[in-house]
Amino acid sequence: MISRKTRKIRIGKLEIGGDSPIAVQSMAATQTQNLEATTRQIEVLEAAHADVIRIAVDNEKDVQALRVLRKQFPESVWSVDLQENYRLAPIVAPFVDKIRYNPGHLFHLEKEKTIREKVEFIVNAAKENDCAIRIGVNCGSVDPDYKERYKDDSVEAMVRSAVDHCQMLDEMGFENYCVSLKDSESEKVIDANRRFSQERPDVPLHLGVTEAGLPPEGIIKTRIAFEQLISAGIGDTIRVSLTLPNDDKGQEIKVGREILKDIEEGRFRSVPENFLEGLNIIACPSCSRVENDKFVDLAQDVRKMTEYAEKYKLTIAVMGCRVNGPGETDDADLGLWC
């Protein structure tokens, strides 16, 4: 396995990048303001030894819940997902170790302000509270300006968005950041991260195949991407995104560590013949954005109902939220959005 060349950044008590161990993380799938359910979810992920736990915050009730939860889990390393409301950054920053923002979401809110002004608002909150930042680019919610500019190359649209945001943070004197470029197709994840790392080899990368779906298919998609990237020295922290019941979310950590161990020891698993040529069911891993958790059952039902079509080149997307749901279903032959 080729050694990584990225700089080290600090997320609370954790370091990633450079020669630091590759961190394995997951995300709470419950609505944050549901304290009982979210407490249970954090306990599940801590029991699985998650290095970082990501929690989404969308409104003031979530912020109040986050404040209570932090008192219960003072030692946990937490990342917060700002969703579509970047203005929550200074309110949540005192309770977390990393802030994740999606460049595509900044386009829609407060259009009278420039993207740079919005990014600077987040950066200032991170600086004042000693937080790291993740620039999280997702194929389902790329900034429309980049989608239009690179309409013939969706991977380049993601890469250019990420590189430009890195430049903004650099110009603002902020270096404690990492980047993610996620797609539901393994090949595009590989391509995007390779392109980015060639241009910015110094920036730590968070790897993941978004909406990978149900196991075992979702595990195979993730393994394909991770094997190609990590063996080449690309990747500093990982997330395995699987569509699972909340109490089983610890499996994401277990699977992630198994994949890392296999790569480190030179064991590359064979992929089933024609795996990427037939039916492709995309399903999100659930998070606090989901308003109807029945979508996990729906994804399982869809797989059973479509067994007859497994040889056909079709994509069915089963989404659970308003954030990536619309974008991910755009390119699917059939989209189901709870």
Predicted features, each with a name:
Residues 322-338:
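Nucleotide-binding motor/catalytic cores of P-loop/tubulin-like NTPases across gene-expression machines
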Residues 123, 138-141, 146-318:
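Catalytic alpha/beta core domains of metabolic enzymes, predominantly
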Residues 46, 50-165, 169-170, 186:
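Active-site beta->alpha loop and helix N-cap motifs at the rims of alpha/beta catalytic domains
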Residues 1-27, 127-128, 271, 304:
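N-terminal amphipathic alpha-helix/helix-capping segment at the start of soluble metabolic enzymes
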Residues 32-44, 84-90, 162, 218-227:
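Short, acidic/polar
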Residues 18-22, 49-51, 74-78, 95-97, ...:
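Short, well-ordered coil/turn segments that N-cap beta-strands
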Residues 54, 100, 134, 178, ...:
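Conserved beta-strand positions in the central sheet of alpha/beta enzyme cores
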Residues 24, 81, 135, 179, ...:
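Conserved, mostly hydrophobic/aromatic
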